[in-house]
Every structure is written in structure tokens, then in C-alpha cells.
């Protein structure tokens, strides 16, 4: 049986669907791991339901057709990651909608898939070693839950310490990855300490010109209010490097994914 449906490399692979297209394929293992939950996709920290997504198979593609047409062009710029001084750097993205369930997170996950594919194939074509973690997905809400877990009063050490280690590991991965998704940065209920850490991640990525896909429930012009920015400097720097896209339509949250 062909393994093509499980592999994000399939649409670019001449062996896809043939006799050599198995779970023992070296490129499949490098991308997805021997068990299908590892490799570079696993290292990206994508939630399990989003790990096989690309722009081609994304369930949000139909409802957000105009955005996806633009994204089909956008992901072609990922080849610039191999240029030392590209004339036009790869832009970051800011995806937002007022309501939930319009496909922002699904789309962001699909874009990570596209980046991993292009990084892996492009590295091989140039006789380079692909990075073990070229891209990283930070679920800001889940990250905040970890923060709360080790900052509550009287939390037992055996609970607080693993949560703290996981929290700071995710923070470092989100800073260091050449490409990252910061999912749902418009969190409204937070503490000064958590907000400071989120600012640190965003500021590090912006300062170092790292490609970032932000998803949010507020437009970029309103993000400063949500993040309680006293000066517009950080938001202005995000805007300078970002393409902003608004997702429209009704929520599909809770419906079975295609």
C-alpha cells in the first residue's frame, strides 16, 4: 500500500504512489519519523490533527479561496531562505478574524507544512543538512496554561517543575526556529509575567528578522491594546514585516474536518 496520503512530501515526490512509497522511505522518516509522529513535523510541535496539512489539502481552502490563492504565491518565496542576502526577504503573515473557527490555525499549520517541505527538499538539492527543527508551532493558549500551572500558589514541585521546564523549552524553540507560528496571540486575560514572556518571543523574532505567522482574533491595528503596549514601536515593527489577511465566514469549529 502506498504511503503517499500520509506524507507531506508526496505532491513533490516522483516516487509517490509507487512501490517505494512506504513508511520505510528515508525522506518520510526524516519528515514524519518512523512512527509517523516524529521527524521534522513532530519537532514542529504541531497538534496531531494538523500534522499532515499543506495548502493543497487544507480543509479551509474552499471557504478562504481568495486567501489561499495569495498563499499559493506566498509559499513560493520560501526558496529565498537559501539566499544569503535576498533582494526581498520572506514576509511574515498576520492572520485574523473576529470570530473563531474560520480556519486561521488550520491555515497556519498548512503553511508550516509548506515551509518544512521546501526546507527539506531545498536542503537536499543544495547538498545541505536540513535543520532538525526548521519550524515551530507555539499554541499561545496552551503555553499560558503551562505558565499558570507552575505559578499557582502552593503547587507541588512534582507538578510545577515539569510544567516550568516544558514552558521554557517551548519559549526557546519559538524564539530560535527560522519559521514559527504564534497561534492566538490575542489572549486577553493574562498576567504581567506571561505577557512579558510573550513580548520577549515576538520582539526576538522581529529583531532578528525571523519569519513568523501570527494568528489572532483582533486586527493588527488593535493588537497593541490587547498586548497592553504603551508605545506603538513593537506593533509598528510587526506591521513593517507582515502581510495581513482577514478570514471571513461562519465558524466551522466542532464540525468534522474534511
Where are these regions (language model features)?
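Residue-level preference for the first positions of well-ordered beta-strands
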Residues: 90-94, 134-135, 179, 211
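Short helix/loop segment immediately N-terminal to the Walker
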Residues: 78-91, 123-129
